[in-house]
Amino acid sequence: MTTLLNPYFGEFGGMYVPQILMPALRQLEEAFVSAQKDPEFQAQFNDLLKNYAGRPTALTKCQNITAGTNTTLYLKREDLLHGGAHKTNQVLGQALLAKRMGKTEIIAETGAGQHGVASALASALLGLKCRIYMGAKDVERQSPNVFRMRLMGAEVIPVHSGSATLKDACNEALRDWSGSYETAHYMLGTAAGPHPYPTIVREFQRMIGEETKAQILEREGRLPDAVIACVGGGSNAIGMFADFINETDVGLIGVEPGGHGIETGEHGAPLKHGRVGIYFGMKAPMMQTEDGQIEESYSISAGLDFPSVGPQHAYLNSIGRADYVSITDDEALEAFKTLCLHEGIIPALESSHALAHALKMMRENPEKEQLLVVNLSGRGDKDIFTVHDILKARGEI
């Protein structure tokens, strides 16, 4: 199929979907390309971002956790966005696209529940029906978000197949869409999947990096040495990285979930520890067995519990423009506690992975003068029960 935009990032990406979905993807690409050139669409999107979602979000300088070091650390506060995470940005854009295409229903998948909440709120706002697929395990561990979705009128459908987590929810959502695309838009929640989704999601998240660049120049008079973001599928990270890719003096650091430790096999770090394959409509690194079956990923944070990664991250890794590292559950938990105790901010466990790596950089080289920005992609209200249970089991509370 001929596309309007390049469906690949180097060798990664593409449109590996059943033929039945090709017209839906073509229609989506055409709608996106025309919307990007339409001042009225852009004005409507920007108005929602400003007056409904609460953009621009703050860039907060950490006051206490850098004490005794020469590191200056800022947090890009996507946790302050309406809905509680960066997810709200791009769902507003996709919901407007759905209306533009004449769709009346939204289908979505969710892991931590943040994309589900964002999809539900955008659907409620714009008068769209919404059904959300969620792994049964995630329904259990993210009950506050499940109730939020239902309060906003969404139907939440637990998925019991496979590992009953995000990858299984993705499969069910795609299956639904293949039979309902004439009336429904599939609101994919990350910068992965078949073209044009990775490009659409990046463009509807790129204001994170654009705002960060303007804010850090105003505050510090220079660009940061590095911007750091957690990577599951990779939407918050690509939103932060996009405006810095051509700023070659700025390091781009993506943090994958190391789970119980890479050596245990219980992690979600396919970029550094997976093999290239085809899954979820794209060619990308993924966790797979010797015979090519998709392996179950694992992370303390439901939103990073994904066995593959967006194709642009795979490309940035392959050309050496971005560095990808991993952080274990325990390291993320320590960072979570540190930010709560010393800055009065409760971060999402996903974002805590990025913070943990920044703290590691700071502690490993306390004398080094460095200016770092962490994308605090979401707030941790949804995670307090998970953290409570872990700390209680350890006898720490």
Swiss-Prot record:
Q: What is its EC number?
A: 4.2.1.20
Q: State the GO CC annotations.
A: cytoplasm
Query: What's the domain of life for this entry?
Result: Bacteria
Carrying N6-(pyridoxal phosphate)lysine, the residues are 87
Under the heading Pfam families, the entry gives: PALP (PF00291)
Q: Which cofactor does it need?
A: pyridoxal 5'-phosphate
Q: Which reaction does it catalyse?
A: (1S,2R)-1-C-(indol-3-yl)glycerol 3-phosphate + L-serine = D-glyceraldehyde 3-phosphate + L-tryptophan + H2O
- What keywords sit in the KW lines? Amino-acid biosynthesis, Aromatic amino acid biosynthesis, Lyase, Pyridoxal phosphate, Tryptophan biosynthesis
The protein's annotated pathway:
Amino-acid biosynthesis; L-tryptophan biosynthesis; L-tryptophan from chorismate: step 5/5
| GO MF annotation terms | tryptophan synthase activity
State the similarity comment. Belongs to the TrpB family.
Q: In UniProt terms, what function does this protein have?
A: The beta subunit is responsible for the synthesis of L-tryptophan from indole and L-serine.
Assembly notes: Tetramer of two alpha and two beta chains.
Please identify the protein, giving its name as recorded: Tryptophan synthase beta chain
Which organism is this protein's natural source?
Escherichia fergusonii (strain ATCC 35469 / DSM 13698 / CCUG 18766 / IAM 14443 / JCM 21226 / LMG 7866 / NBRC 102419 / NCTC 12128 / CDC 0568-73)
